[in-house]
Amino acid sequence: MFAKTYHATHPDMMFAVSNDDLRDRYLMQGLFQDGQIVLTYNHAERFVVGGVVATSPIKLPDQTEPASAAGHPFLERRELGVINVGDTTGKITVDGVAYEIVPRDGLYVTMGAKDVTFEGVDGAARFYLVSLPAHAAFETKKLAFADAIPLERGALETSNERTIYQYIVPTTCKSAQLLLGMTVLKPGSVWNTMPPHLHDRRSEAYFYFGLGENDRVFHYMGEPDEMRHIVIANEEAVMSPPWSIHMGSGTANYTFIWAMGGENLDYTDMNVLDICQLK
């Protein structure tokens, strides 16, 4: 069912880790394959991160393990966030109710939904997926890009002018633990999440897209005084454990989707660091 499983890690495991091992532990590649749903399982907060390329209707699979859950709906005890990251309109049908999802629109699907199907409307549709365990059911809700809460941050002079769009936060869409949004860097800006921060009570996944074929993002992670980096290409994701900073710089401006899960739903629950603390 899952293309790869990522285990939770301790900061001590960063000591002397090779570049290949670092990528193997945190980088999620190959999420978008024609006609497939690709899902990865992360033990950090039990995150599921994945991608869909709907060349024809594709159903979210049922659970396959453990044996006691085999055949049960994927969202029996989970909630799901979806954003259309392609250039064509798609459609998501949840228990018989269809939602048209244009590029940059999203959908929150509540725990307990039984049948979720993805398809294209005017060509193959590309959807990015994140799912977390849920303890309560809420309302399945379309998340229009036009309705997302924009937060303007940074400045062109510091190469980090960006707009943060909040899709799933308590003021716009109720969820059990999932927070979801998208950050768009302005032309001439390349730094995200600057200055960086920590949130010890939450894990976070970053999904980078909108990059050219020859562009890359250098994603920085690790403890503030023991930083490492992972070079990331278009449509790749990275998991940030609670003890790790997370920020990036690109060879050009780009867009990334952030998804968080953990103990609370307070977007501002973070420990902002001074850039001089980094090593």
Curated annotation (Swiss-Prot):
Residues given in the record as Zn(2+) binding sites: 197, 199, 204, 246
Note on cofactor: Binds 1 zinc ion per subunit.
Disulphide linkage map: none
EC numbers for this chain: 5.3.1.17
Cofactor section: Zn(2+)
Top class in the EC scheme: isomerase
One example GO MF annotation: zinc ion binding
Reactions this protein catalyses: 5-dehydro-4-deoxy-D-glucuronate = 3-deoxy-D-glycero-2,5-hexodiulosonate
Listed pathway(s): Glycan metabolism; pectin degradation; 2-dehydro-3-deoxy-D-gluconate from pectin: step 4/5
Keywords noted in UniProt: Isomerase, Metal-binding, Zinc
InterPro entries tied to this protein: KduI, KduI/IolB_isomerase, KduI_N, RmlC-like_jellyroll, RmlC_Cupin_sf
Lineage: superkingdom: Bacteria
GO biological process: D-galacturonate catabolic process; D-glucuronate catabolic process; pectin catabolic process
Cross-referenced Pfam families: KduI
Function: Catalyzes the isomerization of 5-dehydro-4-deoxy-D-glucuronate to 3-deoxy-D-glycero-2,5-hexodiulosonate.
Family: Belongs to the KduI family.
Name of the featured protein: 4-deoxy-L-threo-5-hexosulose-uronate ketol-isomerase
Species, as recorded: Caulobacter vibrioides (strain NA1000 / CB15N)
Lineage, highest ranks first: Bacteria, Pseudomonadati, Pseudomonadota, Alphaproteobacteria, Caulobacterales
Gene name as annotated: kduI
